[in-house]
Amino acid sequence: PVYPPEHVAVIGAGIAGAATAYALASRGVRVTVLEAGAAAQAGSGNRQGLLYAKISAHDTEQTELLLGGYGHSRRLLDKLLPERENWQPCGLLHLNHNAAETRRNTQLAAQTRHAHLYRGVTAAEASVIAGIDILSDGLYWPQGAWLHPAALVRALLAHPAITLCEHQPLLS
């Protein structure tokens, strides 16, 4: 039989490290998170992040993995940040900002397999959704969300089986 570890160390207290620690702690493993600086710095320290599944226009295993992760992320946000002051599922407009994005978004809008997640919109439709003038077409993700990444990191690291050790640089 394979026995799970009793205690592990995770290096880094950004979103990836905090999520890894939380997943392990949720399965009964004690976790020590070692962070060279403070938790939720670098990209995880941004004031705001966007949540949507940046999937391929083609049906691939990676697309299915991303969609599964997207659904899991939404459920986890509901569980960890129920008050909605640090995230909001308010929808997201992904505008066509160059030729490559226009091609990609047009291909996505044409396929119907994931139509429950997004739909193509004209500039006029995007303007109505946003409440301001929008000059380009794009995709609308009604289930898209904004979030405060540092709040998510703090919520993940608050698990009772996680010990956070900040300002602990590792030497090679």
Report residues per predicted region:
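Beta1/beta-strand and adjacent pyrophosphate-binding region of the FAD-binding site
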Residues: 3-16, 32
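Conserved beta-strand segments of alpha/beta enzyme cores
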Residues: 30, 117-119, 163
